[in-house]
Amino acid sequence: GYPLAFVAAKLALGYSLDQIGEMGTPNSAYVAPSVDYMIVKIPRWDLTKFAGVDREIGSSMKSVGEIMSIGKSFEEIIQKGLRMIGQGMHGFVGNRDLEFGDLDKELSHPTDLRIFAIAAALEKGYTVERIEELTKIDVWFLNKLKNIVDYTKVIAKYKTIEDIPADVLREAKRLGFSDFQI
């Protein structure tokens, strides 16, 4: 990686970027390396194990841990991350049937299952704008989640995994779909 702390310390001591030099990396201090990956941290909620605990997420600490997922696209890392949190989910889509009695309420009040309520809303035809209005989540993230839901429709056109063309399968993998989801 890029030795950020080293460069910051040298700059604080009065060195200019061209004085800092190579620092043992192929790039000089004033040329940051290209980063072709993303990382997401997702809290792990296990609220079902605690009797009487309100499922609504607020300022009090209810997380029992977290996961980190690394990949080349947001869609990939969110799907991988949701598989790792230990709720028995297969990713953002393709999960066991979750029933949300009042989907609008589930979207507007953050809970441990809110991300899956977003998936359900997108599958039911909610617009990104409507979900943004209810959740206050930035549309950039919602559009990325919509990409996943939209691609399930592309995959669903094929009866077996063997029928899926290589380019469609490659895109599904780029979007973080597991073999189970496909």
What kind of feature is each model-predicted range?
Residues 1-167, 172-176:
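ATP-dependent carboxylate activation and anion-phosphoryl transfer catalytic cores
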